Amino acid sequence: MTQPQKADEKPRFFRDEDESVINLNESRSLFVQDEADDSDDGQGHVESSSEVSSNTSNHKERFFESLKEILGENMISSSQLHTLWSSYGLLKDGISIAADKFFEDKELLSKSKTESKMPAGDNIEVIDLSDEENDDELSILPSSSQLSQLFTNKRTSTQAGLESPMSSDKGRNRWSRYIGSIHTMGFATRPTVKPVPIGSRLGFKKSVPKDLPLGKSLQHQHCSHLVRLIDTSQDRELGRMPEDVARILYPLLDYSEQVSLEPYLLINNGKRFSVGDNIYIRIDCYLTSQAFVRIEGGSILNKSFINDHGMDTRQLHRAGAIMALFDAINIQPVYGDTKNEMIPNYQENTVSSSQFQDEALNINQLKSFYRITQSAASLQNLPETTPDESLFKLQLRRYQKQSLSWMLKREYEYSHLSEKAAEVSIDGNSMNPLWKKFRWPSNSKQGTPNHEDDCFFYANLYTGEFSIEKPVIKTIINGGILADEMGLGKTISALALICTASYDEAHEKKIESTKKPSMKEMSSQVDSSPLRHSQHKHDTYAYRTTLIVVPMSLLNQWQSEFEKANKDLKKRCEIYYGNNIKDLRAYVLGPNAPSVIITTYGIIQSEYGRTSTSGLFNVVFFRIILDEGHTIRNRSTRTSKAVIALRSSRKWILTGTPIINRLDDLFSLVQFLNLEPWSHINYWKRYVSVPFEKGNYAQAFDVINAVLEPVLLRRTKNMKDVDGKPLVSLPPKEVIVEKLQLSSSEKRVYQSMLEDAENSVKEGLAKGDLLKNYTNILVHILRLRQVCCHLDLLKKTPDLGDPDLEDLENSTQNISSILMPKNIKSPKSSISQDKLDALSANFRDIHSASEQLPSFECAICTTECIEPLSAVSITECLHTFCEPCLAEYIEFQQNKKLSINCPYCRMPISEANVLKLKEPIDAERGYELISFHSHFQSTKIKALLRHLKQIQETSPGEQIIVFSQFSSFLDILEIELRSHLPRDQVIIYKFDGRLDMKERTRILEQFHDKDLSCIKLLLLSLKTGGVGLNLTCASRAFMMDPWWSPGMEDQAIDRIHRIGQQQTVKVVRFIIDNSVEEKMLRIQERKRMLGDIVEGDEAERRQKRIEEIQMLFQ
């Protein structure tokens, strides 16, 4: 026992910094003093027994009651009260000294806790954190074993009462269940006169204003001052909560009947709280019966807000707070075993390199998205349906039979399914994708509502709604998305569907039933019935016609495929150009309606908005199929709006790439399919676009997966069937990168262009306005790529449709001034016209005119009969050589810095003075020589010619594809190849976006016809050739220039390497060494590793492109 405190010492109750508070509140002292004490002499001596007056017993009672008020009745026992009275009861400020002593004496404090009224079995550990620095700790503390076990019994005792049915409300039992706890650290704002007991039940109160102004986002408000932590035993403020926790609590305090939040003091160091002290608390969270809604027939989805104002501000804040609460208590949704394995971890980056750490969502995660739909559809176990042989000519592969079953089910055409397939029906009541399934914590299992499955509950964290029953959404659309990888035969699958179910049988039966009505029906009033109305002259349902919408290049291919597949002569296919059928509406509603109408996206766009009553928009088709459906991905384009405005009872989308650049690419597909409510843009933005733009990829893709799971089917070439065999067996594919060296003249031009580009990038980086110079930089890169292809491209102003300039449409800069033609100087010949005439005369004398053209021999490779004659190079000494041989010899001598002499006679020659025969070449009229450099030949064209001549010698009859992105380069290639290859041995076709439909059809038909006597060469635009074409007749391809995205090139190659290909596919990619093209390959490899970037918005797309540009100049 310590000595009594001297009377003149200040009682230790508040910290020194709070003394001012005490002085200001002396009139409101917390301690009750006896009036007799005021006359005390201040020495603090103990009164003798002779001075004890008759009011001593009252003084003792006041002493006991004051200590109980300060310390709490449950914190101090009767024996302790008497001990403190006997030592300090008669001292001045004895109550204050006794309270100090109570907390300073460890033995007394321990004895107090042992004797206090606590539940049986409680074992409370006191953790002394008085000397720890906690200022930098996280506001929400991690749950350790020590924290989670602390006060377990106390929570259980409290919880037990809450789990029991609550007071009856209009005859209904009310209940609540524990879902988790938040461990957090608040801070004291008021001093306490005594320590708050560990495990004390605290409370929360909201400060005014109760609501934020309408439209205010809680994310931009400070909430810590709006939520007060209350000591319920004293009904006074104890402290405040950290900002992130307060932001959760603030909206939920208005909904305490639905979400119960119970704070308990978690840790105390045995001292009273002073201003600024840390307060460690645990907030136990409960859901009550009032939080749950009854879901009937998916009505909850109809209740969900479709526009931005469907929920008031309080509801929006509540929904956000509940989502944050579930994150804080770390309660996770429950998935099925398979699906749980397939859920991608969108936040985890599998690439260790630091330069890739800030990448946006990538194609690897898109593959995970596809895998989820594939897994959910149980692809390997899908039943098979074989089309009727009397209706369909072709033999389907196994996976195509499965897709036919799936498509028939999506249209609810069960009568056409095989017996086995018909046994498995489609579940039209899939779980609402906004809702998630959660498991009740195991320690709250008792006293649950009386349901079959009381282990789970369902929550819509986007709206803050809860349900005990599974919330479902009925999928009522007839159709879906067939997203098989390119080359797996989506066209054949769609044609099998058309031939199997070519018309609306149910509608036809209704029509038949109205043709011969009974007497009873005739006498009844049925004029307003749907059946009578369907026979009205204004009926627009073409129930026997499927409309197929395709890119123009595929128009005739689809018609040809239909003719190959269809075996029913009653079924017809028509192509609709817009003006070839005078009255489309009357045609498809008439008795001779075609089974299939094929048209293009362009025709639909041109008819959109017209007032005609006979076009596409005045008919409700039986079925609409969009081939290359990603064409409508941009919802703001006229084409997309037009296609979405088409009407039918069944809708299908065929695309190998549902997502191209943005997650919002899917919205137009969803809108076309009428997937309610996702087809409303505000709904889509709220649950998909906005979360994705904010970096919450998991949330956005979680919704997308759930939305598309029932309506999307995708298979890839690498997948295997139930027997472990690949879905398709394709021949090998070889892709070879051939690096080329620029010629000396090309190098000079390239280096000049490169310096300009680097200066522009460095200037932008130095000024910090690289994005402002975006247009300039793209043009510089375009010019560098053009140099790598052909110098003549620099003499032309590129069309803004070129791939590199597709992002410049909205530029405010004067693009024309940037793209001014460049003066590219070729090596200037020193031969005058008179000398040239003299050399021509001498050449004619050496090679006398005759009926047959002479055979020129190359003195380097000794090839006799150089063909064509346009490939003959002639020196000043009039010796002839192959153009590639002489060019290679001159370049070798220049690189070695050796003198250039004629390989035949050793006479000095000059690159600038090399000659060639002037075209047209006519031996009867005599030869005329011109300077070779009047027509420049690029390094890539030389390499291509070398390969083509080898193929010509070893594989006559080969069909070859030459890809390029630049239409102007295809023009140059056509001229060069025609002039250097014998016309009777090589046939050249050119296919790009400038051709009309008839020309495209003619070229493809002629190219497909194999001719063993000659090579057929198709010059193909990468953009045009990457869409839908079937080019399996060819097995060799050359890629003349690279593109940013490897996917674009892969799509083009897949036009060749697909079902129907019988030979090994060989692809050669020409890349200029140590150039911008070589660095583009690195970017492609980077994208293959990380995946093609899916950006949130246009600014992010541009920022990613700038990062790629910086890589080009590193």
Curated annotation (Swiss-Prot):
Pfam families: Helicase_C, HIRAN, SNF2-rel_dom, zf-C3HC4
Cell location: Cytoplasm; Nucleus
SUPFAM superfamilies named among the record's database cross-references: P-loop containing nucleoside triphosphate hydrolases, RING/U-box
Motif (DEGH box): 627-630
GO molecular function: ATP binding; ATP-dependent activity, acting on DNA; DNA binding; helicase activity; hydrolase activity, acting on acid anhydrides, in phosphorus-containing anhydrides; zinc ion binding
Biased composition (Low complexity): 45-57
The protein's Enzyme Commission number: 3.6.4.-
Gene Ontology cellular-component terms listed: cytoplasm; nucleus
Highest taxon listed in the record's lineage: Eukaryota
Alphabetized UniProt keyword annotations: ATP-binding, Cytoplasm, DNA damage, DNA repair, DNA-binding, Helicase, Hydrolase, Metal-binding, Nucleotide-binding, Nucleus, Zinc, Zinc-finger
Residue ranges occupied by any Helicase C-terminal domain in the UniProt entry: 943-1114
One GO BP annotation of this record: DNA repair
Record CDD domains: DEXDc_SHPRH-like (cd18008), RING-HC_RAD5 (cd23131), SF2_C_SNF (cd18793)
Annotated residues for binding of ATP: 484-491
Role this protein plays: Probable helicase, member of the UBC2/RAD6 epistasis group. Functions with DNA repair protein RAD18 in error-free postreplication DNA repair. Involved in the maintenance of wild-type rates of instability of simple repetitive sequences such as poly(GT) repeats. Seems to be involved in maintaining a balance which acts in favor of error-prone non-homologous joining during DNA double-strand breaks repairs.
Official protein name in the record: DNA repair protein RAD5
The organism of origin for this protein: Kluyveromyces lactis (strain ATCC 8585 / CBS 2359 / DSM 70799 / NBRC 1267 / NRRL Y-1140 / WM37)
Lineage per the UniProt record: Eukaryota, Fungi, Dikarya, Ascomycota, Saccharomycotina
Gene, per the UniProt record: RAD5
